[in-house]
Amino acid sequence: MAAPVRQTRSLLGWVTTLGPGSRGYRAPPPPRRSREPWWPDPDDPLTPRWQLGPRYAAKQFARHGAASGVDPGSLWPSREQLLELEAEEREWYPSLAVMQESLRVQQLAEEQKRQAREQLIEECMAKMPQMIENWRRQQQARREKAQADKERRARLQAEAQERLGYHVDPRSARFQELLQDLEKQHRKRLKEEKQRKKKEARAAAMAAAAAQDPADSETPDS
């Protein structure tokens, strides 16, 4: 307990030894503004450019009034500046009517978008049963085609084994070559059959057209 008391007394004694004349740092007072208007030298290269423009003149007029010698009419913006300010104000600070109209247009666009989406959903849902039926038909046709290809492949393999003998390995190169030849012959027969049916259908259509309009082939009586 005695040690802190002695430290406090020593600090107080050190402060008293500084004397009443000693004091700490004191900041200098701010520079006073001139009571008279001050105009910079335009010929001085160190003069800031903004002090030679209308901003500085407006500042002097705002501080000193008529004593600055500034014509108040020269402080008004020009027609071009007014138009620019009006355009900027319309862009960044639109009126209440403009804001309401913009909000109305935005809400109308959102409503139209929502209605279009709902209509699209309704149309898709109406087409869904037919789409499901078409998908099932495609799946059925795909399965039938795969089954037909499998059966055709089995028939060709059986025909190849009959020609080469059942002792031949189906994985051999000779068997595979014969199988490819049989497949080519089968595709050729299918193509010829398709062309024959097309010719027969064309001939039948021409015959039907000729039977429906026999008067075209006859010469009218003079």
Swiss-Prot record:
Region (Disordered), start-end ranges: 1-51, 136-170, 182-222
Sequence ranges of Basic and acidic residues compositional bias: 141-170
Low complexity compositional bias, start-end: 203-212
Keyword annotations of the record: Cell cycle, Coiled coil, Mitochondrion, Nucleus, Ribonucleoprotein, Ribosomal protein
Motif (Nuclear localization signal): 184-200
Coiled-coil features, chain-numbered ranges: 144-213
Pfam families: CR6_interact
UniProt keyword annotation of Iron present: no
Compartmental location: Mitochondrion; Nucleus
One Gene Ontology CC term in the entry: ribonucleoprotein complex
Main location: mitochondrion
Presence of the UniProt keyword Ribosomal protein in the record: yes
Summary of the function given for this chain in its UniProt record: Acts as a negative regulator of G1 to S cell cycle phase progression by inhibiting cyclin-dependent kinases. Inhibitory effects are additive with GADD45 proteins but also occur in the absence of GADD45 proteins. Acts as a repressor of the orphan nuclear receptor NR4A1 by inhibiting AB domain-mediated transcriptional activity. May be involved in the hormone-mediated regulation of NR4A1 transcriptional activity. May play a role in mitochondrial protein synthesis.
Subunit structure as annotated in this protein's UniProt entry: Component of the mitochondrial ribosome large subunit (39S) which comprises a 16S rRNA and about 50 distinct proteins. Interacts with GADD45A, GADD45B and GADD45G. Interacts with NR4A1 via the NR4A1 AB domain. Interacts with ATAD3A and ATAD3B.
Annotated family: Belongs to the mitochondrion-specific ribosomal protein mL64 family.
Protein name: Large ribosomal subunit protein mL64
